[in-house]
Design a protein with these regions (language model features):
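C-terminal, non-catalytic macromolecule-binding modules
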Residues: 170-191
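Active-site bordering "gate/hinge" segments
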Residues: 1-164, 169-172
């Protein structure tokens, strides 16, 4: 199975303060899923694997070699899953890698780091700048400047240039994600 998602947004921001900003935002994602099957001791087992990629590119980004890499990754994952065993239960250390685990991080704490929730005092992070909010070694960034990544933009929807924002550094809360309104109300710069 394969899925292709593509969009091409052209954005113009015209603010009341006279700011004019524009951005072109292509976005593509190709996903490949395979199902592998094996019979072991008379028991049929089926497992899935997936591969894919994309970013802020046009459709020409995908070539035959890249497509083959995605298929190979999906096949490898499915075959690896055929050999898997149930995960142990209980409390354990979890290590998140780069990429899609960032969505888990975003949902778990990202919304709580938004300026409006903190200004209103409805976030667990409200009033905690400068305090330890995560384990030592944990750094969380909001970085819209990483070239060609899904979350990368030249300007945000308010016409502000994208930037690299350190939210948590070595476990210490450094700041919040700020739109223009909440930044002004909190006396800080928009992020």
């Amino acid at each position: 199975m394969a899925g292709l998602a593509a969009e091409y947004d052209v954005v113009m921001v015209a603010r009341a303060d006279g700011t004019l900003a524009a951005d072109v935002r292509p976005l593509v994602r190709l996903s490949v899923t395979v199902i592998a099957e094996a019979t072991v001791k008379g028991v049929v087992r089926r497992e899935m694997g997936s591969g894919g990629g994309g970013g802020r590119f046009g459709l020409a980004y995908f070539d035959d070699a890249m497509l083959n890499e995605y298929v190979d990754a999906a096949v490898h994952a499915a075959l690896t899953n055929l050999e898997s065993r149930p995960a142990p239960a209980g409390v354990m250390t979890v290590v998140l890698g780069s990429g899609w685990p960032g969505i888990l991080l975003h949902e778990a704490i990202g919304h709580g780091l938004e300026g409006d929730f903190n200004r209103k005092g409805s976030s667990a992070f409200s009033g905690r700048i400068g305090q330890r909010v995560a384990a030592k070694g944990v750094t969380v960034l909001d970085d819209g400047t990483i070239s060609d990544r899904r979350g990368s933009l030249n300007v945000d929807d308010e016409g502000c240039a994208s930037q690299r924002n350190v939210l948590i550094e070595d476990g210490i809360l450094k700041g919040y994600i700020q739109d223009s309104l909440n930044a002004r109300l909190m006396g800080v710069a928009p992020t």
